[in-house]
Structure formats: C-alpha cells, structure tokens
C-alpha cells in the first residue's frame, strides 16, 4: 500500500498534519508514503485531480486508488484506509 501526500511548503494545514503522517510512518512501516509538493509537481497533482491541500490518496498494491482524504484529519481517519 502507498499513500500519496500532496502538500505545499506554505500550507499551514499541511504543516500541522506532518506529525500525523510521521506517526503513521512509524506505526505502519510497510506502507510507503510519497510526499508530493504541488508547486514542484503540479502535473502529478493534476493527474490525480487534487484540488486542495493537504490531500492524501491511498493506493493498493496495483496502484489503484482505494481512498482519499482532503484537509486536516485526525490520525484515525487516515488510519481507517490502512486496515
């Protein structure tokens, strides 16, 4: 499983969520987390139809989207996609 973490350096909610993402990285070492700066990788953001940040897209082993969360969320909301 993989999480695509769409963010920007200037985004306050993205910065606030950094601790939550780091916690998920520690608790689920088998899950890969790819951080995508929308200012530097705008084409990738467009390809995934990311309209606001932070956006977290959950992909299965085949690379298919199985979940999406937008905005600041509690860790439990993100974690439900990992079970």
Give residue spans per PLM region.
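Short loop/turn elements that flank and shape the SAM/SAH-binding pocket of Class I
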Residues: 41-43, 75-76
């Amino acid at each position: 499983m993989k999480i695509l973490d769409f963010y920007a350096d200037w985004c306050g909610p993205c910065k606030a969520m950094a601790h939550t993402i780091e916690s998920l990285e520690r608790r689920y070492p088998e899950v890969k987390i790819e951080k995508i700066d929308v200012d530097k990788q705008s084409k990738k953001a467009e390809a995934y139809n990311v309209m606001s940040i932070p956006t977290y897209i959950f992909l299965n082993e085949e690379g298919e989207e199985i979940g999406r969360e937008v905005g600041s969320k509690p860790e439990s909301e993100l974690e439900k996609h990992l079970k």
